[in-house]
């Protein structure tokens, strides 16, 4: 098992949490992005740069992640595809997507996209706060206790 990170949009504070977890637990963390991502020197952390382009990083993650792996992403369509493939998906706010919740998220995403295309200003998600960071760290720890065996 390893952790994959959709790193193009992943907040730095979440990456820092993942770096600490990788070294503490000994799990491989791979950040995938279409630009260079600086990572600390560690045998448990690596960065993969893919070509720039729409969904290139997402496609790489889908191709490389194996059932049982965990992907950190806020990309709902990516999370849906991963869950279908038996891969776990956790967003940077600490929500572990499931087969049940991902469908609801997709419907809401599509609804908001329809609203935006009709001219309604919907705004984006609020900034990540301390509670979100703590929730992410807690959910990640809980997930790893249940699923990661050295």
Swiss-Prot record:
Superkingdom: Bacteria
Pfam families named in the record: DUF188 (PF02639)
Protein name: UPF0178 protein PBPRA1738
Origin species: Photobacterium profundum (strain SS9)
Signal peptide location: none
UniProt cross-references to HAMAP family, sorted A to Z: UPF0178
Homology family: Belongs to the UPF0178 family.
